[in-house]
Structure formats: structure tokens, C-alpha cells
């Protein structure tokens, strides 16, 4: 079915169990779906934008209220809506990092974090991951010390991934923040896989910035995200314009410089707000998500030669599997090669695992019901047995 011209109507979430790691927690709530239809027109959220002419002051829809509520929810002082987490990274580096200045990165960070340093001509110095793919406070301290010796001063910022996108492992955020603050370095908590999925309290963690992704983990349309900060850094990162035209004398009120005046508009903003009540509630039930995830990982581990490449037992629903000794062995002689696994899953209404990959692959069960998790587990077992693999 086409919804317009050559644009096919998307029915992945309705027709399949979707295991794509970046899509699992971004599925819209029914409330967001309705809000998207109602507020889809261009500058719709500007219907009631009056003095001081800034989106976070708009009360209809309740954008202003959302800013206050979300800041409290994250244990921070101020928030700003942004078009995706990457724009939050860019806004922070744009305010804090200068040409040639060092920024500490985890070594397992998303490419957009690196690019946010590159765009301001900064320099990245990485924290070396452990052999089991963790970022530790000791390793962070070593990287900071190395940077101090190299540059003669402390790095301008430390990025910390709460849960990394490669393995879905959890890292020592609170301990790393304490180390960074010993050098007076601000800490950015990258919560794209936690904000909206797990409880997050920035002040308890001791971080200066919390970044969340609306379309990845807060059941919101893309592009959407949140930048939360403390009062101390709000004055710097969320600063307002001071520029003035030399001929006209024009000024621009309290427009924010880092976001070029106005933040998130239209469907991304209203969809994020519409999903928020459910998102606030669901973070309290992550233990149930882990139970469902365990059903699937237990089934996979029962297939001889299969391992969990991520930390184990699992603490997150994004997991990297190592099937080099199981599914990849079959792929070497199967007529479909590495595509046999995704093909077999697709026949069972399961999608989201990268086609052609059988050595190591990621999946995310967030949002699945117990029944769906059991079906998924049974499907992996069936595929293994169909290919004469040892299960038990």
C-alpha cells in the first residue's frame, strides 16, 4: 500500500517483531501517533508563540510545562529540546571546546560524539576500553592524565556513555564523573540508550549534562532529543544572544545562540511531549524488560557454540551475540550463505537483525511482551534445529 506517490506505507511494527537496536524504544505511543497527525503542519507549535518569542515559553501545546517537568525528572536544573542527541553534543562542544583543545571520549562512543568535537576543531583523546568492553574510572583517570601532560592543561569535556551502542554494556558513570571533577572537567552523560528506558538522575550521578534521544529511547518522532544541564552550565551552553546589527541596531531578544534561536518544532516536539507520561512510567519497569530479554538470550545460549559477547548477566536489552561457532558455521555451506539467518527470521515475522551477518550481531528486545519473547526464543531454536545444530 502506498500512502502517497511512490512512498510505501510503513508497516514494520504492525507486521513484525522488530529487533533493530536503534528502533526498539523509539516506537510511538498511541498518544504520540494522534499528536503527530494533529500537529504535523510546519510551524504548528508557533500558533501561540508570543513574547518573549521562544519555543520553551509556549504553553499551548504545553512545551513550557514539559521543560520544567522533564528537568525535574532527570534530576537537572534546565533542559532544552534538540533535533536529536547529536545536536546536543554539538551544542555543548560549541560552547566549551575551542580549536585544538582536547576532549575525552570513551573509545566506544557514537560517531556523532566524535564529529561534535571535530566540527569545533577540537581534539579527541580516548579512554581505552577493557578487554571485556567496559570503560572504567581508572582508565578515564589515565586518559585525563595523559592529556594533561600532552596539552599542559585539563581536557575541556569528558563524554561518558551510560550504555554503549556496540555491546549494550553499562559503564562506571558515577566513578568517572568523580575523577573528571577532580580536574574540574565537566561531564556529559550520553543517555541515548537509558533516558526514557531506565531511571536517570543526573545530579546523583554527578554529571553536568544529560543527553537523551527522543527517537531512540523516548517513543518520539525523529529528530528529537533532550539536553539537560545544571544552572552553572546553563548560563554558558544555553546562553542567549547579545549580537546587534551595526547599521540597523537590531537585537534578537532571548533567542538561544547554540540552537540558533528556536529549539524543537512541530511533530518531534509534540510527539515527545505526548509520549512523556507513558515514558515516565515505563522506566520503573525495566526489570520486566530484562526478564523478557533473558528468555531470548537463554534460548540462544542453548544453541551449541553461541555466546553473549556483551557483559553477562545482561543489564540492558541491547545485546551483542557471538554466533561464530553456531550460525556462522552453517552460513559457510548454506546456499544462502550468511543471509540464511535473517531469511529464516523474516519468514517467521521477525526483522531488525542485519541481513547477511552471522558472526556477531546485535538485537534489542525492549518493548516486547512475554509472549513475543517466547515466540522469538522458540524461533531461534527452530532455526537451529532445522539446520541440524545441537540444542540443549
From Swiss-Prot:
Per UniProt, the enzyme's principal EC class comes to: transferase
What molecular functions are annotated in GO for this chain?
Sep-tRNA:Cys-tRNA synthase activity
A Pfam short name: SepSecS
Q: What is its EC number?
A: 2.5.1.73
Q: Which residues carry this modification: N6-(pyridoxal phosphate)lysine?
A: 216
* Obligatory cofactor(s): pyridoxal 5'-phosphate
What catalytic activity does the UniProt entry give for this protein? O-phospho-L-seryl-tRNA(Cys) + hydrogen sulfide + H(+) = L-cysteinyl-tRNA(Cys) + phosphate
Binding annotation for pyridoxal 5'-phosphate: 85-86, 190, 213-215
Q: Which GO terms describe its biological process?
A: translation
Identify the domain of life. Answer: Archaea
Q: Which keywords does UniProt give here?
A: Protein biosynthesis, Pyridoxal phosphate, Transferase
Q: Give all cystine bridges in this chain.
A: none
Description of how the protein assembles with itself and partners: Homodimer. Interacts with SepRS.
What PANTHER family does this protein's entry cite?
Answer: CYSTEINE DESULFURASE, O-PHOSPHO-L-SERYL-TRNA:CYS-TRNA SYNTHASE
Q: What does this protein do?
A: Converts O-phospho-L-seryl-tRNA(Cys) (Sep-tRNA(Cys)) to L-cysteinyl-tRNA(Cys) (Cys-tRNA(Cys)).
Protein family membership? Belongs to the SepCysS family.
* Protein name in UniProt: O-phospho-L-seryl-tRNA:Cys-tRNA synthase 2
- State the organism of origin: Methanocorpusculum labreanum (strain ATCC 43576 / DSM 4855 / Z)
Q: What is the lineage of its organism?
A: Archaea, Methanobacteriati, Methanobacteriota, Stenosarchaea group, Methanomicrobia
Amino acid at each position: 500500500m502506498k500512502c502517497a506517490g511512490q512512498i510505501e506505507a510503513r508497516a514494520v511494527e504492525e507486521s513484525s517483531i522488530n529487533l533493530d537496536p536503534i528502533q526498539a524504544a523509539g516506537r510511538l505511543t498511541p498518544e504520540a501517533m494522534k499528536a503527530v497527525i494533529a500537529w504535523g503542519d510546519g510551524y504548528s507549535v508557533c500558533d501561540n508563540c508570543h513574547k518573549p518569542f521562544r519555543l520553551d515559553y509556549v504553553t499551548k501545546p504545553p512545551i513550557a510545562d514539559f521543560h520544567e517537568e522533564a528537568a525535574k525528572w532527570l534530576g537537572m536544573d534546565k533542559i532544552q529540546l534538540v533535533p536529536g542527541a547529536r545536536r546536543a553534543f554539538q551544542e555543548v562542544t560549541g560552547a566549551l571546546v575551542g580549536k585544538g583543545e582536547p576532549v575525552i571520549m570513551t573509545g566506544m562512543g557514537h560517531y556523532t560524539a566524535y564529529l561534535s568535537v571535530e566540527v569545533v576543531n577540537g581534539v579527541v583523546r580516548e579512554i581505552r576500553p577493557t578487554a571485556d568492553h567496559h570503560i572504567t574510572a581508572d582508565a578515564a583517570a589515565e586518559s585525563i592524565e595523559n592529556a594533561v601532560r600532552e596539552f599542559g592543561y585539563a581536557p575541556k569535556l569528558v563524554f561518558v556513555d551510560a550504555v554503549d551502542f556496540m555491546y549494550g554494556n553499562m559503564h562506571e558513570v558515577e566513578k568517572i564523573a568523580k575523577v573528571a571533577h577532580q580536574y574540574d572537567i565537566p561531564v556529559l552523560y550520553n543517555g541515548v540508550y537509558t533516558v526514557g528506558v531506565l531511571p536517570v538522575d543526573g545530579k546523583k550521578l554527578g554529571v553536568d549534562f544529560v543527553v537523551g534521544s527522543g527517537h531512540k529511547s523516548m517513543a518520539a518522532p525523529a529528530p528529537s532529543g533532550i539536553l539537560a544541564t545544571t544552572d552553572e552550565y546553563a548560563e554558558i551552553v544555553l546562553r542567549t544572544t547579545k549580537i546587534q546589527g551595526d547599521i540597523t541596531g537590531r537585537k534578537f531578544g532571548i533567542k538561544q545562540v547554540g540552537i540558533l534561536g528556536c529549539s524543537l518544532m512541530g511533530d518531534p516536539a509534540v510527539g515527545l511531549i505526548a509520549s512523556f507520561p507513558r515514558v515516565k512510567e515505563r522506566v520503573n519497569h525495566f526489570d520486566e524488560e530484562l526478564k523478557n530479554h533473558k528468555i531470548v538470550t537463554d534460548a540462544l545460549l542453548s544453541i551449541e557454540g553461541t555466546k553473549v559477547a556483551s557483559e553477562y548477566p545482561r543489564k540492558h536489552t541491547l545485546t551483542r551475540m557471538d554466533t561464530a561457532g553456531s550460525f556462522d558455521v552453517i552460513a559457510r555451506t548454506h546456499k544462502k550463505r550468511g543471509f540464511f539467518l535473517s531469511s529464516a527470521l523474516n519468514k517467521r515475522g521477525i526483522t531488525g537483525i542485519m541481513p547477511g551477518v552471522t558472526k556477531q550481531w546485535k538485537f534489542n528486545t525492549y518493548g516486547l511482551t512475554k509472549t513475543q519473547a517466547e515466540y522469538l526464543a522458540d524461533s531461534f531454536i527452530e532455526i537451529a534445529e532445522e539446520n541440524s545444530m545441537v540444542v540443549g
